Design a protein with these regions (language model features):
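Loop-helix junctions at membrane interfaces
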Residues: 1-165
Length: 165
């Protein structure tokens, strides 16, 4: 049991660092699709809570490198919702829906009060950030599902999940 927890913790840290590096060097203005790609992969491999931890760690690192608090709020809900859906259904494609809804709606809406409180930005509506978060979540979640489908077809996903179980 302790060995598997250690493996999950190490993989969580590796996924957080992978997301940070990809988002730092492959940059699209106001978009972080690789965060959502890694969120989907984390939700399937390590589950919702370790996926949340990976997203939180990456978000904190991104904030320390000059991003806003949106680096955290835009990342943490997707792996939780996607991971819970995967835990219940074992369907990789439904993780996509969890990531897009978790980030595109919950992440966007939760950003509004924090941006207002910490940065003084009053966007007039809690739904203001949805059109900015959703495209990044769609693109990133699609990449994550594509990676998982390839891993599944080559039986690597099954071996990784057995190793972490």
């Amino acid at each position: 049991m302790q060995k598997n927890v250690t493996k999950k913790m190490v993989l969580t840290a590796m996924l957080a660092c992978l997301a940070f590096v990809l988002n730092t060097f492959v940059y699209f203005p106001a978009m972080a699709p690789f965060q959502h790609c890694v969120d989907v992969i984390a939700a399937v491999l390590v589950g919702p809570w370790y996926g949340f931890a990976a997203a939180l760690l990456c978000g904190i690192m991104r904030m320390l490198s000059g991003r806003t608090i949106q680096a955290v709020t835009g990342a943490i809900y997707g792996p939780i919702l996607g991971g819970l859906i995967y835990k219940k259904t074992k369907n990789i494609y439904l993780v996509w829906i969890g990531e897009v809804i978790g980030t595109g709606f919950f992440g966007a809406v939760s950003s509004y009060p924090l941006m207002k409180m910490f940065y003084g930005l009053d966007a007039q509506s809690p739904f203001y950030y949805i059109p900015f978060y959703t495209p990044a979540a769609v693109v990133g979640a699609t990449m994550g599902v594509a990676v998982l489908v390839i891993l599944k077809k080559t039986s690597v996903l099954e071996r990784m999940q057995k190793e972490l179980a």
